[in-house]
């Protein structure tokens, strides 16, 4: 705070130099842009929201996004890894964002809906103990009004998903259980109903995940750029959430297969896994994408969400090696964030299908965490100007027409819970 006050005191003395430099810049580039266009570029910031991974801990992001929208701070660009890519893809599908309906949709999640037995084939993902069924669970949500799959280019808010590509040399050296098309060792049919963390074999695999959090093993790949704008949004989010050796995703859309083949070839990788392995809170990647012209402006406020920072919990000591490895990434990413929200408390990262009451609790926690950030983001997003008594009026942004199916259509496609366990769980927690 003292440093900010000192900077404000110095600012008045720099005003003259700033005015002079502004005039020189406008004169030098008079054939490229007008003074009004320069002022509009410098005076207005875009909101870039970076959503980090963290499994079930990321349910707090729903409440965080609710608070952002309440403040009128709709993201201009979203980028996410792992669970953050799932929430980002959902929020980006339509404008205005029907956040309350998304909360109702999230409350229909179950383990049987999102997890299944390991697949018999492997082509683009990495063999795991479970098949990730998010694409099936969210099929209606990621359909256009005409019934086609929503592609990255169809999203109402610009969104990109970060996946980790396993380098070919590292992929070839992996144990066969990671590469071969075989059933996982854990085959109990009851597991999809239960928290993923209960199985000792799953816990053992999770310990091995830390080995993938290494730039010599994986590299970050951004899905949503010009080369990948035709990817299905649900496939991008699913690959970004595929914990190596635990959750395995493969596309079910034949149209996607040549696109994925090309992605592996172009990036010289052997498989796509959880984006958190390469960049769990990808603020640096967000900054580079904006620098490269993603938004048409470089003047942006970078707000980062992190739910997977080390938190003491004796029930989940097995997560410590992973959270510590992830924190090493933050040394590189944190300087690019204007503000970093470290959510606390959170749900367990292993709780991938919380009950209705538990989701409500996570939303409250997330709402409270982001509420403390609103004064900061509000100040950062305040326009600035040089002439007159008010900021220049920016040009009207083109209206974005949502092509996503209505939420009433999505909700009507969700089967009501028929399993006694699901009904009992929600009744007990309501």
PLM features: what roles do these ranges have?
Residues 1-16:
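Phosphate-/polyanion-interacting regions in eukaryotic proteins
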Residues 54, 64, 84, 161, ...:
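Conserved small-residue
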Residues 55-144, 165-167, 171-194, 375, ...:
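Patatin-like phospholipase
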Residues 109-114, 129-130, 177-183, 224-226, ...:
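Lipid deacylating catalytic domains
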Residues 143-159:
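A short alpha-helix-loop-beta-strand transition element characteristic
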Residues 160-288:
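Active-site gating loop/helix substructures
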Residues 272, 277-279, 290-300, 304-311, ...:
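C-terminal helical/tail subdomains of lipid-metabolizing enzymes
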């Amino acid at each position: 705070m003292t440093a900010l006050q000192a900077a404000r005191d110095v600012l008045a003395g720099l005003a003259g130099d700033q005015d002079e430099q502004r005039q020189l810049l406008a004169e030098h580039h008079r054939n490229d842009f007008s003074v009004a266009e320069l002022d509009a570029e410098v005076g207005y910031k875009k909101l870039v929201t970076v959503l980090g991974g963290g499994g079930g801990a990321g349910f707090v992001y729903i409440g965080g996004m609710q608070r952002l929208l309440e403040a009128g701070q709709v993201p201009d660009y979203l980028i996410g890894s792992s669970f953050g890519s799932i929430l980002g893809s959902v929020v980006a599908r339509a404008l205005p964002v029907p956040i309350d309906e998304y909360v109702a949709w999230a409350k229909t999640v179950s383990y049987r809906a999102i997890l299944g037995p390991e697949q018999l084939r492997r082509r683009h993902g990495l063999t795991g103990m479970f098949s990730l069924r998010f694409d099936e669970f969210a099929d209606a949500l990621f359909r256009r009004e005409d019934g086609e799959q929503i592609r990255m280019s169809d999203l109402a808010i610009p969104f990109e998903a970060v996946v980790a590509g396993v380098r070919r040399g590292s992929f070839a050296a992996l144990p066969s259980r990671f590469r071969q098309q075989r059933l996982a060792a854990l085959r109990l049919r009851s597991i999809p109903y239960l928290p993923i963390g209960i199985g000792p074999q799953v816990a053992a695999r999770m310990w091995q995940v830390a080995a993938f959090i290494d730039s010599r093993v994986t590299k970050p790949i951004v899905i949503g750029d010009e080369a990948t704008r035709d990817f299905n949004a649900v496939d991008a989010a699913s690959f970004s959430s595929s914990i190596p050796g635990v959750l395995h995703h493969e596309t079910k859309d034949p149209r996607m297969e040549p696109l994925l083949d090309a992605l592996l070839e172009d990036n010289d990788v052997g498989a796509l896994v959880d984006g958190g392995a390469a960049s769990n809170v990808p603020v640096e990647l967000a900054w580079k994408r904006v620098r490269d012209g993603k938004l048409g402006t470089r003047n942006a406020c970078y707000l980062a969400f992190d739910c997977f920072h080390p938190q003491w919990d004796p029930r989940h000591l097995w997560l410590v090696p992973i959270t510590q490895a992830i924190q090493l990434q933050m040394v590189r990413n944190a300087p690019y964030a204007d503000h970093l929200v470290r959510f606390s408390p959170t749900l367990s990262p292993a709780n991938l299908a919380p009950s209705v009451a538990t989701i409500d609790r996570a939303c409250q926690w997330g709402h409270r965490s982001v509420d403390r950030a609103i004064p900061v983001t509000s100040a950062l997003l305040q326009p600035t100007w040089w002439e007159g008594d008010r900021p220049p009026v920016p040009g009207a942004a083109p209206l974005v027409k949502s092509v996503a199916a209505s939420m009433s259509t999505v909700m009507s496609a969700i089967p009501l819970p028929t399993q006694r366990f699901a009904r009992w769980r929600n009744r007990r927690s309501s």
